[in-house]
Amino acid sequence: MGWKTVMKQQKLIEKMTIEEKAAILSGKTVWQTREIDRLSIPSIFLSDGPHGIRKQAGAGDHLGLNASLNATCFPTAATIANSWNQDLGEEIGQALGEEAVSMDVNILLGPGLNIKRSPLCGRNFEYFSEDPYLSGKMAASYIRGIQSKGVYACPKHLAVNSQELRRMAMDAVVDERTLREIYLTGFEIAVKEGHAKAIMSSYNQINGIYANEDKHLLTDILRKEWGFDGIVVTDWGGSNDHVKGVAAGSNLEMPSCGYDSAREVIAAVRNGKLKEADLDERVGELVDAVMELTSGKKLSDKNFDRNAHHQLARKAAAESMVLLKNEKQILPLDTKKSIAIIGDFAFSPRYQGAGSSMVNPTKVEDMSSILQQYDLNILGMTRGYQRNGDVDENDRKFALNLSMNADIVIFCFGLDEISESEGLDRTHMRIPQNQIDLLQDISKVNENIIGILSAGSAIEMPWHTCCKAILHGYLNGQAGASATLDILTGKVNPSGRLAETYPISYEQTPAFRYYPSNEKTSEYRESVYVGYRYYDTSKVRVQYPFGFGLSYTEFTYSDLIIEEDGIKVSVTNTGDRDGAEVVQMYVGLPNAIVFRPEKELKGFAKVYLKAGESRQLRIPFDDKTFRYWNIKTGQWEIETGTYQIMVGASVADIRLTGMTERTGNSKGYPYNPAKMPYYYTGIVQKISDEEFRELLGHDIPNGRWSGNLEINDAICQMYYAKSRLARLIYRCLTKMKKKSEAQGKPDLNILFIYNMPFRGIAKMTGGAVSMEMVYGIVDAVNGHFMLGVKKIIGGYFRNRRNNKKYEKLLKGAGGKCR
């Protein structure tokens, strides 16, 4: 098998008919694979669950329109990344694995580790960081925990999936170096260190090739370079050409699309477009996984320890919150002072994002219900503002009066549900204005405001001067309220550090002019300068830098020792409280020949120290510490030079610096600095076509739509349709989308359809619609109504006949593939 060992189930594969082989590579239902009864190959169950299991009790659907079983809602990945604690990630992973086992889930679809290219990505709350090294390390910890319970983790979405707009119909135009260093490194760590047994391919194209059909990605890189020995699963409805996917290295098309894809696979084998050896290899990899996941498995324990998992969620939330500001040490709270609590989020917490990751929690805390458990002098509490933007003048006046009479105001605010969701990117970085208006009015009557933020991604903070303290809870799960009060009262010393940069304004961000995309392409002109790599290199002042976070104590650094294989550094807690520090190691190469960021995170350690305690830490170098991807030679290389090793409390707070000499192995440098001046300065907001073309090494693809709509164009592009009916459908969809936005809650079904390509109609309807029928729909949309209707009607009856015929072939094999 080339880079692989012989399949464990080789004899079983040899007994399968070609119809069974083709059928098993597509799902049976929305969440299950097909079983083959005559060969005792069982079905397995896949479920969403990056921060909690979302297994539906009734008929399954991709977006959770039907209720799911109760599960622990842990803080989202964006929150846990702020803990910088791999042990915590593994502990959460173990709990997720336990709950998956209790619900008979075999593969858990998570964690998500796409890079936060822009703060506007609607799904950033599901992703760890703007930094690939931190993302990969945290993902690997989750994966180890999940898989320790006999469940496969399925990190997603491979790769370059950094936007929701037209995500199923978008082509990411990115150079190979940026692809490798920024967008693949996290997955590489997840595979090599987490030993992930499944990977989900992304919806989008990468340089003109769908991720699920990209042999360079799925075979050359994933399997051969990284040693991946698991299965590749499509995102739901993310299969474009199933035959090409199988040839490239994809094992499982989800969800069920009937037998349409299976027929395509058989035809491709018979006409020579697909090698039967490739088909056998994909089937072998999948059957190996199925048998490993089900062999010797006992009946699951349906009763996981709900209370223990709730307490873990509380611990995780407390360790992941970031104290951004604490003037005059207003925190921890003085229990003698009177406190007013204002804000809708204190009554109805926003603890998770919207979309396929939405969990039905075992219980949810809110601040208003648990205050009696804490020794606080609460003067009163009220909402003060409406979540949907409406104004209740009486409640507003009451909030101001309450604030005027209190010693301290705790103001709970943040992004509402419509601001962050799968299927919908943000259009700005601002918190709803009605919340800020109230905050500013309160600041005029009380200067002692403690802001409690809830948001899954970076926001603009022009109002930060209104607050004496700011505690950012992100989306902190079902136990977030008690975790917040634990920090406010000093029961827990905050130790979260930002896993992403907070710019002053969206216009500062590196991809500001390129995000989200043209009509067909998204151009990654900023190259490797993502997040702090851009701000730090181009000297852009930010609100809060990557890695930043305050504590109730102080830490000093000393005695940096640089060795051949790592560093040693001493850290001392010089305050009067026990606490934890996140020690961050950055590496840079001054006067580099190859352009690169000024510094990059290459190691970190979280250390817990008692008051007055000192400890020496060791942070090792690894194979990623000094490397860069040489596009000229097509390999990882090290540039010869004197590297700067910087150790600090954030990317902007470097405490100790040293140097180390490294002899490189470069076999020719890839760039001409004269042709790429802005890449060498890091000022990448206005990259010209000429410079981007030089970076890519080829012409820039045309990103504009032209001509008739095709099966891979998004349904939201029907504003170009020649059919009046199609344009009417587009207007209706747009109206329904805007209505849900105005109500403050995203309609996930509408959002999914809106951004779905026409081919998705066949991929998401369980076999009721064939690709032939989709071509008829597209003909009708393009103005050929009668031709389209003829194809739709004829295709419908042919699809029914062919499905029945396929079922008979499977039964004729002596059993059933269901």
Language model: regions and residue ranges:
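Charged, amphipathic alpha-helical linkers/stalks
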Residues: 651-652, 658-729
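Terminal connector regions
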Residues: 623-670
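Long, low-hydrophobicity ectodomains and other hydrophilic envelope-associated domains
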Residues: 694-818
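Glycoside hydrolase catalytic-domain context in secreted enzymes
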Residues: 1-624, 642-647, 651, 756, ...
